Amino acid sequence: METRYTHSPEDIRHYSTEQLRKEFLVESIFVPGEVRLTYTHNDRMIFGGVTPTDKPLTIELSTELGVTYFLERRELGIINIGGPGSIVIEGTEEPMKKQDGYYIGKETKDIQFKSEDPANPAKFYTVSVPAHHKYPNVRISIDNIEPMVTGDSSTLNHRSIYQYIHPNVCQSCQLQMGYTILTPGSAWNTMPCHTHERRMETYLYFDMKEDTRVFHFMGKPDETKHLVIANEQAAISPSWSIHTGVGSSDYTFIWAMCGENITYNDMDMVPMKDLK
């Protein structure tokens, strides 16, 4: 497990491109046959990829957590962005095709991840945050989620937001997680942009061609910086930072948040005139 520490806005003012990428970009997430996780001290979120091939994988306990098993004091969200597979939760196997999700509550001890075809493995994107209460495990299908459609084709930001782990779908302590699909011809996500001082967020960008890039903007609104992001890479967004991006071609992204509350619309909008 890789660890990333927190930063003040003043810390990053003079960062080089290399320094910024080292601190806020996670480049290697889905590695066949491996579990790749990142522990960010921003609200203590753990996120990453589980990519089983010819044998099941489990999330092994790390000394950073100081507990006897991974979800002893945590909850977990999962979305499959790869081939068909399954997760085995305390002996019960659940099939997971692409876009299927799962919420797994605190105190769940045994979780295994499997792929049907090692040549086309499942890619389980996982996000875990601290939890104070055990809520029921819930299987989540994108087919059962009413998307929130927002933006407009004239502003190149028309998109459908599927809220997977959200009070309308399932209970959670503080984790929110969802899947945003841009309408063909749109390029911007989360524009106009915002911050939310009460929550941090991560973005996983995927479903991108090899030569497609997303220019992900971050930083304080009056002092923005950017990360150039390739397929299946993720960005860490502290609570004080804007988080918005524009793609050179089609892409999809998964967002995940945690912090003080689970009120999706609790955000501070940034007028375009204030961006620099």
Residue ranges and their predicted role:
Residues 32-65, 158-201:
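A short glycine-rich, His/Asp/Glu-containing loop-to-beta-strand
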Residues 78, 93, 101-103, 124-126, ...:
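Conserved hydrophobic/aromatic beta-strand scaffold that supports enzyme active sites
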Residues 214-217, 246-253:
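Short conserved catalytic/interaction loops centered on acidic-Pro-aromatic/His motifs
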